[in-house]
A protein has these predicted regions:
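Short hydrophobic/aromatic-rich beta-strand segments that constitute the beta-sheet cores
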Residues: 61, 78, 112-114
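Short, conserved beta-strand element in jelly-roll/cupin
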Residues: 54, 63-78
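Short acidic-glycine-tyrosine-enriched beta hairpin
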Residues: 82-98
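Conserved short histidine dyad/triad with adjacent acidic residue
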Residues: 43-63, 97-98
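A short, N-terminal "cap"/entry segment at the start of jelly-roll beta-barrel domains
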Residues: 1-46
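Ligand-binding loop in jelly-roll beta-barrel domains
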Residues: 98-117
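Conserved hydrophobic/aromatic beta-strand scaffold that supports enzyme active sites
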Residues: 49-51, 68, 93
Length: 117
């Protein structure tokens, strides 16, 4: 088995230090406009690793890909359709399968490391 523990601090440190570009308003926002910034760290076809940051507010999602996230800073409540809410914050990970539907209520500007696959 490969030891990957050394990669986690590297990825988190790189993600926190990444210069983010303006990615415009969040299309999934369901209230006031929410601003997003981000940086793609690696991409190959439909697979992508990057950093995403978004200002507070409510949004609704229908995911077209699988997504794994590691929260670097900020807080949000994730509520799948028909399921209970889950609060996530710094150091938490979450996996959203393709087709996942639900809401994200971002309470504090969130920065996440994401993997699309």
């Amino acid at each position: 088995m490969t030891d990957t523990t050394a990669a986690t601090p590297f990825l988190a440190a790189a993600a926190m230090a990444a210069d983010l570009e303006d990615w415009g308003p969040l299309a999934e926002a369901t209230g006031e406009p929410m601003q997003t910034t981000g940086s793609t760290l690696w991409a190959d076809g439909d697979q992508e690793v990057g950093v995403w940051e978004c200002t507070p507010g409510p949004s609704y999602w229908t995911l077209e890909t699988n997504e794994a996230v590691y929260i670097l800073s900020g807080r949000m409540t994730v509520t799948p359709d028909g399921g209970p809410p889950q609060d996530i914050g710094p150091g938490d990970t979450a996996v959203f399968p393709r087709g996942w539907q639900g809401s994200w209520q971002i309470h504090e500007t969130i920065r996440k490391l994401y993997v699309l696959f």
